[in-house]
């Protein structure tokens, strides 16, 4: 679904930006790459992530993340499913690393989708909120 050549093109940006994330929602989206429910759900979750973590989340559910090794080594993650991207975003926001969003093409998936829209959306939403609450508790204790 992600074009490898698009990823190669963004690598030089790592010199100035420690975290790059592919923004599928600002396109271009290939026809049939994402249905309306998933598109709207991604927009909603990204808006929630932006509000809760107070940093821009153009496409919080993107699976295309590129970051410097020094940033990766500071991450503490425990997610196993589709909420991993939300946890990545929340952890980076807590570390003060606002992602740089790079528009990338997104193609239609070959084969069956693994995502269950509503259930995974709820898990992602929960992860975004829980990580923010936990971070706030650490700060105020």
Feature annotation, model-predicted:
Residues 22, 59-60, 101, 137-141:
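Short, hydrophobic secondary-structure boundary micro-motifs
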Residues 55-56, 77-80, 89-107:
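Catalytic donor-sugar/metal-binding loop of nucleotide-sugar-dependent glycosyltransferases
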Residues 2, 84-91:
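Short active-site alpha-helical segment characteristic of glycosyltransferases
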Residues 91-93, 117-119, 134-135:
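Short, charged/polar low-complexity linear motifs in solvent-exposed/disordered segments
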Residues 124-141:
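C-terminal, non-catalytic tails of nucleotide-sugar-dependent glycosyltransferases
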Residues 10, 88, 128:
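Aromatic/hydrophobic pocket-lining residues that form π-stacking "cages" and hydrophobic walls in ligand
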Residues 4-82, 108-119, 124-125:
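Acceptor/aglycone-binding surface of glycosyltransferases and processive sugar-polymer synthases
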């Amino acid at each position: 679904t992600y074009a490898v050549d698009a990823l190669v093109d963004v690598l030089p940006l790592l010199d100035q930006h420690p975290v790059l994330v592919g923004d599928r929602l600002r396109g271009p989206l290939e026809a049939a790459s994402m249905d309306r429910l998933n598109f709207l759900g991604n927009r909603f979750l990204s808006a929630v992530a932006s509000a809760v973590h107070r940093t821009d989340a153009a496409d919080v559910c993107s699976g295309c993340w590129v970051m410097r090794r020094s940033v990766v080594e500071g991450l503490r993650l425990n997610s196993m499913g589709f909420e991993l991207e939300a946890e990545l975003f929340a952890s980076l926001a807590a570390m003060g690393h606002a992602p740089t969003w790079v528009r990338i093409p997104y193609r239609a998936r070959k084969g069956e989708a693994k995502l269950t829209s509503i259930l995974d959306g709820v898990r992602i939403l929960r992860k975004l909120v829980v990580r923010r609450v936990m971070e706030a508790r650490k700060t105020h204790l």
